[in-house]
Amino acid sequence: NDYQSPQSADAIEYKLNASDNQLVADTYRQKYIDVMDTVLSAIRTKRYGQVMSFFTFEGLDVFNELIAYGTARIVGDGKVNFFQGASGRVSARGLQMSFSFNVGRNGKKTFVEDVVFTFNEDCKIENVSFGLGEQSTNDILCREAPGWNNATREVLTTFLENYKTAYSLKRLDYIKTIYSDSAVIIVGNVVRPKPANTSSSEMSISANGQNIISYNRYDKDSYLANLKRVFANNEFINIRFTNNEIQWLEKFEDRKVFAINIGQEYSSSRYADSGYLFLLVDMT
């Protein structure tokens, strides 16, 4: 058993407050340590009943979905870092978990994810999400640009973490709340080159054997209906974000609208590709 008690200095690395470089008071911090100690133990032993009281209703719902995502287990040393953001919420970051799925007769697909636990002001876990990864997180948290402050960085990071988690856990009801009713959603798919013996008319979709991207345009309702079918037809879906560019669109003077362009590696039991996700997000 590679579990280390969070009371050990080797198991928990106490980080500075991300907003003002002040350590959380020892008595205040200890509450979070005790909660995470019990949660980590429950994940390892699969005795989840003992931690239900540490979650809000919504937080417990997401936690139950996350631990049912394939075969879940903690990997690494179980080290957790505590951060207090501009909103005052405390998040426990750095925990790595692996999630494995059987593929075909003898195959296995495993994803390793950073898992983030977010606490409310009553020290209850109100949300659990997959982290963005070091590169994407640093691109947001270290960015200096007009319209940016610590609150903006926190909101954007949280939004993208929840977005990624919702698709992986097939949380269609949550995804419905992300898009506006007037949203236009364009989805691209890689069309594989046709074999050499196909007709000339069929070959016209592929130039010199290169992959072609097929685009489909949806309104919100048709996109969600299609996404529901995708969720039903795939045992697993996983999204991994890489580099990103985020810009505040200053022309919306009375609103905080951000253009997000982020590298995305999409993997499912039936299809996989790499591309870019572009979102216009109104943070007003």
Please describe what each predicted stretch is:
Residues 3, 14, 28, 32, ...:
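Sequence-level detector for tyrosine residue identity
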Residues 3-5, 10, 104-152, 251-261, ...:
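Short beta-strand edge/turn micro-motifs at domain boundaries
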Residues 4-7, 22, 30, 50, ...:
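Residue-identity detector for glutamine
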Residues 13-16, 53, 62-65, 71-72, ...:
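Generic preference for hydrophobic/aromatic residues in regular secondary structure cores
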Residues 34-67, 170-198:
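Short, well-ordered alpha-helical segments enriched in acidic and aromatic residues
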Residues 59-118, 199-274:
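Surface-exposed, charged secondary-structure patches
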Residues 129-216, 220-244, 248-253:
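Acidic, serine/threonine- and glycine-rich low-complexity intrinsically disordered segments
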